[in-house]
């Protein structure tokens, strides 16, 4: 599920090393070489997810709560985000052409919105972007900060929809900044500024933004309290933060890199966190949550399946 609240791969050499005991003919190796059909890959994914859920739900209610509290405590001693260079290598510094072939027209690299009236991926992207604007209470003339702007789906949508707004977009990826800036030049948008910076080092002037929006970036964050303190400083009086984050209904856990089956943590989401739906409710010292919405995980399922169709087509 996801929740919303208002308040060719470039890698390092170590990233492509595989555990010595993993055979070239293991299921993981075969999947990486596209030698397995999607049906078998899905079966393996379901098995790994089921194993993780059994581990996280093991024991009684008290032990599950203690695990949750331990993760909460670890977040408070971490830097804002970890393994930011790995995230770039795994996702954000791939050539934009790959994403143009896989994603929709807006290049939205996050969940889209589907219902019985949604015709296709392009329409699903548009539906979710409109939903963000409604729930974040965006309006023309605002100064808006987007943290983790990706390939510019929301940034460019806002620039088009709100020509009198000033939009500051932040990404840790140079290719993403260059891509968005090129799109702005092509479309004549003069109201967008793109900053390339690691979120740990991002420095901005106080009390300048009416809105801060962040779409599926908080999953890369560990120290929510520290980041929310900074965001509170960047917001003007009366300003609001809107966050879209994928999550589990009840469980919170980091993606580890120490097991032979931890493919996701090692090669796709290093340093990432699976937050629980109520995680941000535990971090309201500097910003108070006014509203929270939950969306079914089927929206992401349909989005990912549409990406897969595009990828297979090309």
Residue ranges with predicted function:
Residues 225-240:
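A short glycine-rich, Lys/Arg-flanked "PGG" loop and its adjoining helix->strand segment in the class I
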Residues 1-87:
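N-terminal accessory segments
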Residues 141-150:
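Conserved class I S-adenosyl-L-methionine
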Residues 151-163:
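Conserved SAM-binding loop of SAM-dependent methyltransferases across substrates and taxa
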Residues 200-212:
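A short acidic, Gly/Pro-enriched loop at the edge of an enzyme's catalytic core
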Residues 186-201:
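Conserved SAM-binding strand-loop segment of SAM-dependent methyltransferases
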Residues 52-135, 139:
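Conserved Class I S-adenosyl-L-methionine-dependent methyltransferase catalytic core
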């Amino acid at each position: 599920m996801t929740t919303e609240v208002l308040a060719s791969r470039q890698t390092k050499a170590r990233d492509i090393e595989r555990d010595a005991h993993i055979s070239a003919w293991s299921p993981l190796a075969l999947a990486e070489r596209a030698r397995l059909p999607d049906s078998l890959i899905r079966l393996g994914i379901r098995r790994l997810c089921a194993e993780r859920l059994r581990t996280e739900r093991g024991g009684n209610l008290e032990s599950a709560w203690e695990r949750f509290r331990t993760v909460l405590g670890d977040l408070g001693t971490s830097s804002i985000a970890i393994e930011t260079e790995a995230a770039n290598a795994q996702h954000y510094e791939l050539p934009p052409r790959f994403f143009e072939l896989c994603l929709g027209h807006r290049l939205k690299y996050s969940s889209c919105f589907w219902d019985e009236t949604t015709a296709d991926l392009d329409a699903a992207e548009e539906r979710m972007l409109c939903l963000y604007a409604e729930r974040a209470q965006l309006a023309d003339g605002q100064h808006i900060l987007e943290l983790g702007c990706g390939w510019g789906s929301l940034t460019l949508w806002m620039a088009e929809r709100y020509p009198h707004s000033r939009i500051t977009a932040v990404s840790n990826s140079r290719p993403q900044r260059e891509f968005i800036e090129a799109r702005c030049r092509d479309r004549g948008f003069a109201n967008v500024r793109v900053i390339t910076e690691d979120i740990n080092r991002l420095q901005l002037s106080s009390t300048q933004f009416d809105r801060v929006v962040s779409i599926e970036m908080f999953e890369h964050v560990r120290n929510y309290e520290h980041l929310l303190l900074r965001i509170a400083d960047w917001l003007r009086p009366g300003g609001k933060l809107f966050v879209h984050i994928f999550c589990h209904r009840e469980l919170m856990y980091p993606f580890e890199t120490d097991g032979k089956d931890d493919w996701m943590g090692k090669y796709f989401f290093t340093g990432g966190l699976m937050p629980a739906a109520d995680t941000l409710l535990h971090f309201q010292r500097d910003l108070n949550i006014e509203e929270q919405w939950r969306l079914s995980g089927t929206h992401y399922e349909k989005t990912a399946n549409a990406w897969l169709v595009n990828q297979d087509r090309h």
